[in-house]
């Protein structure tokens, strides 16, 4: 899906690194040490928490910046001299302090809709900071293949709320992703919900982030 969106927006894909594919099966299947990878302006990384950190470091070894949407790990784990961690609009950036070049853009969720949801969550949390009768909780539901729990998006929502928040994680079927933030009191309940209808929103957001990184 990322490939489809990138091509539709006029970008060239120089290669795909996927351990389930064998070099030679497809002209675009490459490895990190290939000339094609070294020519890339940016790499988009969506894998697992077990492989993401190493993938980022291998991309950096060739000077290629990365847009990373893999959750279950944190960019703070990347301790490289001259690189500085920043947070901008809910995303974590790693910037080379010597050149000023952004080498990593990481987000728990690149979906445009989810980032609007993040802003709604921050606003509601600010209002509720003056209403101690309400207790927050978060429920996140994803497909059975998702490894990390709670989801990175749920963790971001909890961090924005700023107080101790119970998070319920549900894994069922092929659910793309549903996040619900509930504020409950004896008098009433306030709920905000984001429901992903598929993976396209995540892919589009990642491509938009790659475009911004490469401007």
Can you name each region flagged by the protein language model?
Residues 43-44, 48, 67-68:
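N-terminal Rossmann-like NAD(P) cofactor-binding module of classical short-chain dehydrogenase/reductase
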Residues 1-37, 50, 132-215:
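C-terminal substrate-binding/catalytic lobe of Rossmann-fold NAD(P)-dependent oxidoreductases
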Residues 36-43, 61-64:
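Short acidic/histidine-rich motifs immediately flanking catalytic phosphotransfer sites
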């Amino acid at each position: 899906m990322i490939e489809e969106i990138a091509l539709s927006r006029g970008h060239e894909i120089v290669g795909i690194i996927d351990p389930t594919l064998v070099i030679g099966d497809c002209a675009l299947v490459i490895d990190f040490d290939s000339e094609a990878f070294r020519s890339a302006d940016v790499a988009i990384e969506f894998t697992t928490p077990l492989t993401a950190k190493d993938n980022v470091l291998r991309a950096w070894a060739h000077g290629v910046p990365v847009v990373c949407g893999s959750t279950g790990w944190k960019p703070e784990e990347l301790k490289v001299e001259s690189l500085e961690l920043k947070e901008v609009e809910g995303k974590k950036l790693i910037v080379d302090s010597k050149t000023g070049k952004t080498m990593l853009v990481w987000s728990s969720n690149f979906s445009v809709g989810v980032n609007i949801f993040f802003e709604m969550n921050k606003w509601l949390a600010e209002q509720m900071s003056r209403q101690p009768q309400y207790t927050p909780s978060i429920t996140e539901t994803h497909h059975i293949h998702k490894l990390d729990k709670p989801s990175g998006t749920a963790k971001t929502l909890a961090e924005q709320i700023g107080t101790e928040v119970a998070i319920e994680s549900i894994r069922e079927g092929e659910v793309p992703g549903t996040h619900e933030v509930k504020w409950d009191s004896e008098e009433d309940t306030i709920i905000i919900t984001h429901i992903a209808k598929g993976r396209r929103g995540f892919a589009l957001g990642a491509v938009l982030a790659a475009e911004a990184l490469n401007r």
